[in-house]
């Protein structure tokens, strides 16, 4: 069992006084696999003050100094990918061979490599006539991250913050805290200066809220639910600090009538079920021509039944458990709601898959004949539940897609790239994937509407951690 009860504050591993202990549960076995400490406002204050003391020195380091440290982090990270992947599998259930090793752990490394690449070529100053425009580190940052892609979400914040010259306090999810602890070890090993990076475990009320509210925190970057994001914004408001939010989604996957139907449905089902549906940008609404609904249902059922649910340590497992008992119950409630509202259940349903007597395993579930008024069409379920929604024409498909309080991602499949591009222009989302295109580490990630504000990834995420200063008369008259 992992004993991760220490915090990392001011370059030291410290056992926090007065902190409660919390058990970390392996969602595949429902057994205790670790212990952490739940911090308090006092621990947050210690970490923030350490970050504040470190800021003046770290913010004045040269680009080359920060780049050298980032490159050391990348080398150390790469050497520990297997260890990190196993920790992710243990803490939140991602299948080791098919997800944690090829995607979850390398995604974290990818953000550090991208941050180093951006920093290498980034110009922090530019001239506008006699005025000099300077980009400077934003300050002390409070970083609050979720459990679904634990290290990916951490690295998407920590890497650009380090590159920009900020100092920080990280609060990872108490449900999946192992990979954050391993990253702190890497920082300690490579010699990140004391106070530049601090780790305080805890829950939202005990650590997240005081971190967002702390007067010495200049910027808060939060990824999680829209409900929690509003609480973070409220806590941060009295100090008028910058707040960047990456929140929920209910992404539409528009399959146009000229698309390769089998390819589009297969990709849509598999992408939806990836990570057991626990991705904010999951294509959870599949919009299909009414004339092809029967064929889509047949294909979707076929591809759904191919998915292997089981022990995340087995190499043939496609999807593992949901990350917690609470999430399992939420998904079950949503499936019940779909049945009660009269949606057509074509695959899956309530309870665990056959042969799995324990663990937070849910059946990959597909509903069809879903309309936009139904709860399952509007709620972010965050589990392996796909809604198939028929439309009459392209304009109606776009209207259905945009009829959501969320606006994180969209997906379009078409035999005509030009047609797909035209639909993409009309979607009110922060990203659109055309014909199965993958995510891009250099592209911005973030949403419209209640999916949040600000952007992560690439230079766009890097610039979130910079302030802009205008120095007039810099060149003289």
From Swiss-Prot:
InterPro entries associated with the record: Ald_DH/histidinol_DH, Ald_DH_C, Ald_DH_CS_GLU, Ald_DH_N, Aldehyde_DH_dom
Catalytic activity of the protein: 4-oxo-4-(pyridin-3-yl)butanal + NADP(+) + H2O = 4-oxo-4-(pyridin-3-yl)butanoate + NADPH + 2 H(+)
Binding-site list for NAD(+): 202-208
Known pathway: Alkaloid degradation; nicotine degradation
Molecular function GO terms recorded: oxidoreductase activity, acting on the aldehyde or oxo group of donors, NAD or NADP as acceptor
Broadest EC class assigned to this enzyme: oxidoreductase
Gene3D superfamilies: Aldehyde Dehydrogenase, Chain A, domain 1, Aldehyde Dehydrogenase, Chain A, domain 2
Active site per UniProt: 246, 280
Keyword NADP: yes
Enzyme nomenclature, EC number: 1.2.1.83
Superkingdom per UniProt: Bacteria
CDD domains documented for this protein: ALDH_CddD_SSP0762
Keywords: NADP, Oxidoreductase
SUPFAM superfamilies membership: ALDH-like
Record function comment: Catalyzes the dehydrogenation of 3-succinoylsemialdehyde-pyridine to 3-succinoyl-pyridine in the nicotine degradation pathway.
PANTHER family attached to this UniProt entry: ALDEHYDE DEHYDROGENASE (PTHR42804), ALDEHYDE DEHYDROGENASE-RELATED (PTHR42804:SF1)
Similarity comment text for this entry: Belongs to the aldehyde dehydrogenase family.
Name under which the protein is recorded: 3-succinoylsemialdehyde-pyridine dehydrogenase
């Amino acid at each position: 069992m992992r004993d991760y009860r220490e915090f990392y504050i001011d370059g030291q591993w410290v056992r926090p006084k007065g902190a409660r202990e919390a058990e970390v549960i392996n969602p595949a076995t429902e057994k205790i696999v670790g212990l952490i400490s739940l911090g308090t406002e006092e621990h947050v204050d210690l970490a923030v003050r350490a970050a504040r003391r470190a800021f003046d020195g770290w913010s004045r380091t040269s680009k080359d100094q920060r780049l050298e440290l980032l490159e050391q982090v990348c080398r150390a990270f790469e050497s520990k990918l297997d260890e990190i992947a196993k920790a992710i599998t243990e803490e939140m259930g991602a299948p080791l061979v098919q997800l944690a090793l090829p995607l979850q752990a390398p995604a974290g490394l990818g953000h550090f490599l991208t941050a180093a690449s951006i920093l290498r070529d980034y110009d922090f100053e530019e001239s506008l006539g006699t005025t000099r425009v300077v980009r400077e580190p934003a300050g002390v940052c409070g970083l609050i991250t979720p459990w679904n892609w634990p290290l990916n979400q951490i690295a998407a914040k920590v890497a650009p913050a380090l590159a920009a010259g900020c100092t920080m306090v990280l609060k990872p999810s108490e449900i999946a805290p192992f990979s954050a602890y391993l990253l702190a070890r890497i920082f300690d090993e490579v010699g990140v200066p004391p106070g530049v990076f601090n780790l305080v475990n805890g829950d939202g009320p005990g650590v997240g809220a005081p971190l967002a509210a702390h007067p010495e925190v200049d910027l808060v970057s939060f990824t999680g639910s829209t409900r929690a994001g509003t609480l973070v914004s409220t806590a941060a408001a009295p100090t008028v600090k910058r707040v960047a939010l990456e929140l929920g989604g209910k992404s539409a996957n528009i399959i146009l009538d000229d698309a390769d139907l089998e390819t589009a449905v297969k990709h849509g089902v598999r992408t939806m079920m990836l990570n057991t549906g626990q991705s904010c940008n999951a294509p959870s609404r599949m919009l299909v021509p009414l004339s092809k609904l029967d064929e889509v249902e047949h294909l979707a059922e076929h591809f759904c039944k191919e998915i292997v649910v089981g022990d995340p340590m087995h190499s043939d497992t496609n999807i593992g458990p949901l990350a917690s008992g609470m999430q399992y119950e939420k998904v079950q409630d949503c499936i019940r709601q779909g049945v009660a509202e009269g949606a057509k259940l074509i695959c899956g349903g309530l309870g665990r898959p056959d042969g799995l007597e324990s663990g937070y395993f849910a059946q990959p579930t597909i509903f069809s004949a879903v309309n936009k008024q139904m709860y399952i069409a509007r709620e972010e379920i965050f589990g392996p539940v796909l809604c198939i929604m028929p439309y009459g024409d392209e304009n109606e498909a776009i209207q259905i897609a945009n009829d959501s309080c969320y606006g994180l991602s969209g997906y379009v499949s078409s035999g005509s790239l030009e047609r797909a591009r035209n639909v993409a222009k009309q979607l009110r989302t922060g990203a659109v994937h055309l014909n199965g295109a993958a995510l891009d580490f250099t592209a911005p990630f973030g949403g419209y509407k209640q999916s949040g504000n600000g952007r992560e990834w690439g230079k766009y995420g890097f610039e979130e951690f910079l302030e802009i200063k205008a120095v007039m008369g810099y060149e003289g008259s």
